Every structure is written in structure tokens, then in C-alpha cells.
From Swiss-Prot:
GO cellular component: cytoplasm; nucleus
PANTHER family noted in UniProt: OS08G0374000 PROTEIN-RELATED, STRESS-INDUCED PROTEIN SAM22
Protein encoded by which gene: FRAA1A.1
Family per record: Belongs to the BetVI family.
GO molecular function: abscisic acid binding; protein phosphatase inhibitor activity; signaling receptor activity
Biological function: May be involved in ripening of fruits.
Quaternary state and interactors: Monomer.
InterPro entries: Bet_v_I/MLP, Bet_v_I_allergen, Plant_def-hormone_signal, START-like_dom_sf
SUPFAM superfamilies recorded: Bet v1-like (SSF55961)
Keyword Ubl conjugation: no
Name of the molecule in the record: Major strawberry allergen Fra a 1-A
Species classification: Eukaryota, Viridiplantae, Streptophyta, Embryophyta, Tracheophyta
GO biological process, one term: fruit ripening
Keywords from the named record: Allergen, Fruit ripening, Pathogenesis-related protein, Plant defense
Length: 160
């Protein structure tokens, strides 16, 4: 088994506390509302939403995947960090056991946010994951993030 790590960093004009509330804490409600073609629904299968919780995300008709299951490892509201693993679903190929994700939102000097993400692909056997394989997922996540950012700009009184 191998572990392949990819890091990404991008910025937003939205303050970190507001972005964390929308992007992490209320994502299960907000994303199906603003991008139903991407995510149809999210439901908790086990737990209370905190660490140890298992969630099932059902994708919308615009996706070529059906569902995934996430296991939440940590949510730190004060430091704006979130970590979880993709543990099941058709987004995992036969060569990938799981994918660990860590997201940290850091307040930027200009009042916005620096978003730092780390993805760790745990492969089965000697399979190698190349960055080109990860690129499509990064692009979809970036598009979804831009939708959330746009929603927050259009609805400035929400998530304060």
C-alpha cells in the first residue's frame, strides 16, 4: 500500500469564520440547495455530526458518481479545521482504499481567507496515483467552492 499526498492552497475574500460555517458546518444543507446537480443530499448514518460520524453523500444527476461515505475525524470551530476520510463509494476506484482530507481556513491579512487542503490517497498494492488523476477532482471541488463563495457574496447577512 502506498500513500500519495497532494496539497493545494487558494484564497477567498470571505472571512474565515463565515466561510467555515457555510463550507464545513452547513455544507450538507447549503450544497444541495445551490448545486443540486452536483449533490442531491447528505445524510448522517451514524453519530451526531462530530468526530466518528459517518455521512452518506448522494450525488445529483449531473455527476457520474452515485454516492460516497465520509468518516469525520475532527472539526475545530475555533481554528477552522476539518478532517475526514472518503471510505466508501463509487468515487473510489478499485486501486484506492480511502482518501484522507484535511482542510484549514486561515484568516488572511486583507480580511479574507487562505484555504489550505491536503489529500492523502491510500492505494491498494503498488498502484501509483499521479497528480493528473487528481486534477479532475480538484477542479470539481474548486467549482463547488466558487459556488459557495458566490452564494455568500449574494447573501451577505447569512452565516454571520
Amino acid at each position: 500500500m502506498g500513500v500519495y499526498t497532494y496539497e493545494n492552497e487558494f484564497t477567498s475574500d470571505i472571512p474565515a469564520p463565515k466561510l467555515f460555517k457555510a463550507f464545513v458546518l452547513d455544507a450538507d444543507n447549503l450544497i444541495p440547495k445551490i448545486a443540486p446537480q452536483a449533490v442531491k443530499c447528505a445524510e448522517i448514518l451514524e453519530g451526531d455530526g462530530g468526530p466518528g460520524t459517518i455521512k452518506k453523500i448522494t450525488f445529483g444527476e449531473g455527476s457520474h458518481y452515485g454516492y460516497v461515505k465520509h468518516k469525520i475525524h475532527s472539526i475545530d470551530k475555533e481554528n477552522h479545521t476539518y478532517s475526514y476520510s472518503l471510505i466508501e463509494g463509487d468515487a473510489l476506484s478499485d486501486n484506492i482504499e480511502k482518501i484522507d482530507y484535511e482542510t484549514k481556513l486561515v484568516s488572511a491579512p486583507h480580511g479574507g481567507t487562505v484555504i489550505k487542503t491536503t489529500s492523502k490517497y491510500h492505494t491498494k498494492g503498488d498502484v501509483e496515483i499521479k497528480e493528473e488523476h487528481v486534477k479532475a477532482g480538484k477542479e470539481k471541488a474548486s467549482h463547488l467552492f466558487k459556488l459557495i463563495e458566490g452564494y455568500l457574496k449574494d447573501h451577505p447577512s447569512e452565516y454571520n
